[in-house]
Amino acid sequence: MNKRYPILFLALGVGVIAINLISCVSIPKGATAVKPFKKDKYLGKWYEIARMDFKFEKDLNNVTATYSLKDDGSIKVDNRGYNYVKKEWKQSIGKAKFVNESNEGRLKVSFFGPFYAGYNVIEVDSDYQYALVAGNNLKYLWILSRNKSIPENIKQQYLRKAESLGYDTATLVWTKQD
């Protein structure tokens, strides 16, 4: 029976390593997260202006993300959007934690247990009204606003920044907000 313990510990160790690898959070090459980042100013409701499309947001418009502080110091993430094909609202509740320090806009977000993805605020205006957010890699990008629209000069600034990092901004989906 003692011979089974090393195998059990090995299996547990491999499992922990696998979860850490799957939950790997990173930032696209050349990108840097906002620092200093003011968490309290970032909390609240954001409207999605544009995104790189992926399966969890397919066919959604009127997308919002609302961030609120939880008692344990993590951030509650409440994403909502209207599926215009199925004619129904979709909601996803998750949590976000800071990767390093809370004064740096590098977070990891999870909607599925121990599995995290990168959420990197790489640009935000001084009033925290507009934000450019990168995921783990060049497949994930969001332009956010506190309002349902964004000024053209901010939009162009964020597009230039994304392109300088290697994003193909021609593939952005411009989210309908009505």
List each model region and its residues.
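A beta-rich soluble binding module of mature secreted/lumenal proteins
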Residues: N2-D178
